[in-house]
């Protein structure tokens, strides 16, 4: 499965490869508790969710120190894959549904992503000054 990511992002470091490989098991575990990815779609996780999330990186790479706000992050797409790809940028994943943020938190902790914050709030109550990035919301 990592071969699909490698095809488009051949310069991944060993730790990044490990994090991308670990995504499947982490999301599989969380998805049994909180359905954030369609069960019929889950086998296509890397193509339909991870690679799709990373597509923005080809046209908008995030510089070291960049701060990115993902509003309506759902289960962590695109925040989680982008936080892996850009470890020097800082991401904040926001969703109004607490159980989705719980998934993002569990996945981020499982991957050791120190550059990804999570917030369960509504946009109109969030006063972040971070850049917004396109999201599935």
Predicted regions and their residues:
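N-terminal auxiliary segments of SAM/dcSAM-dependent transferases
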Residues: 1-37
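Conserved alpha-helix/loop element of class I SAM-dependent methyltransferases that forms part
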Residues: 29, 33, 46-64
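Short, amphipathic alpha-helical segments that act as regulatory/interfacial helices
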Residues: 24, 54-57, 137
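Single conserved hydrophobic/aromatic residue that forms the stacking wall/gate
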Residues: 123-137
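Generic structural signal for well-ordered secondary structure
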Residues: 20, 46-49, 73-75
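Conserved SAM/SAH cofactor-binding pocket of Class I
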Residues: 54-122, 129
